[in-house]
Design a protein with these regions (language model features):
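Hydrophobic h-region of N-terminal signal peptides that target proteins for export
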Residues: 13-22
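Soluble non-cytosolic domains of exported or imported proteins
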Residues: 25-29, 73-78
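Short, non-transmembrane amphipathic alpha-helical segments
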Residues: 74-94
Length: 145
């Protein structure tokens, strides 16, 4: 009887250890290197011109510059933010903010800077917990630069 109890304890201990450490976490550098690979999977993805991870005012920021086509502007912005959310959820330390610089391919239109709260954006794109209207109002800030 004591052997069975010992086996049960060992099994439970192993199960807890595996479940706690089951999700792989990546460094900031690894996350930054995964973004271009994510974009390479889709031939309609916008072109990436810069990827950075940095800290500012105690916040961790994932920064991405993309070239956008004004005909597919909305889709390219959402694609880039979705990619940032999908990849960054695997970071060892979570990001606070996503910064997306959209460089226009037309000189008549100004470039735009999009700042999005990372947790809210991940909840919107990955877990589908935040509806689009709420995400746009509460989590997103778009300004011309």
């Amino acid at each position: 009887m004591s052997h069975i109890n010992n086996y049960i304890r060992i099994f439970i201990t192993l199960f807890v250890c595996i479940s706690v450490h089951g999700k792989t976490k990546f460094t900031d550098r690894q996350v930054a290197m995964m973004i271009p690979k994510y974009f390479a999977r889709d031939h309609n993805a916008p072109k990436i011109t810069r990827t950075r991870v940095y800290g500012e005012n105690g916040k961790k920021i994932l920064h991405l510059n993309i070239e956008v086509n004004r005909n597919r502007y909305e889709n390219q912005m959402e694609y880039a933010l979705s990619a940032m959310a999908s990849v960054s959820q695997h970071a060892a330390r979570p990001f606070d903010t996503f910064v997306l610089i959209m460089e226009q391919n037309s000189r008549q239109v100004n470039d735009e800077k999009v700042e999005a709260k990372a947790k809210c954006t991940i909840d919107h794109f990955v877990f589908k917990r935040v509806k689009n209207d709420r995400w746009v109002k509460k989590c997103l800030n778009v300004e011309e630069i």
